[in-house]
């Protein structure tokens, strides 16, 4: 079943997580009027998305020098997830596009399906690769937003991702609440 969830343009777009560090679940969420769409994502996807948005907006500014500058400007409370957190699907491939006529960025998320997963040894699709118009299998969502909304999303994702587990000063691995086995200390727990 192919289903496209299209919010053009969004009233708000945000990301967040729930759970304890090391066990967190990440969400991407957008709203247009009464329609709220929540997607389940992986932390690394969110981090790649934040970097991709920043790079993409920088490239747009360089390519279209007549565009007014977009700046990051948000309050943490504006970027909080809304209830209910009922994900439509788990995101597999994420991509970005730009509508020059409307000056809107589009974030496209395709559902992670068995057919969409990378084969062993194969690299997953990157943000800068072309996106198929229709999902090959499963659902897709398109969130159309201003450059400022997307930059705010990228900045907020960076904040959310950085709130994870503290890192060990010796091996730089995450430290769980119960400690961790550090190879630099011959595997002793600390």
Question: What does each of the following model-derived ranges do?
Answer:
Residues 37-80, 86-88:
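Short, well-structured hydrophobic secondary-structure segments
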Residues 24-30, 49, 53, 105-109, ...:
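Short, structured motif recognition centered on aromatic/hydrophobic residues
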Residues 114-181:
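Mixed-charge, glycine-accented linear interaction segment located at domain edges/termini
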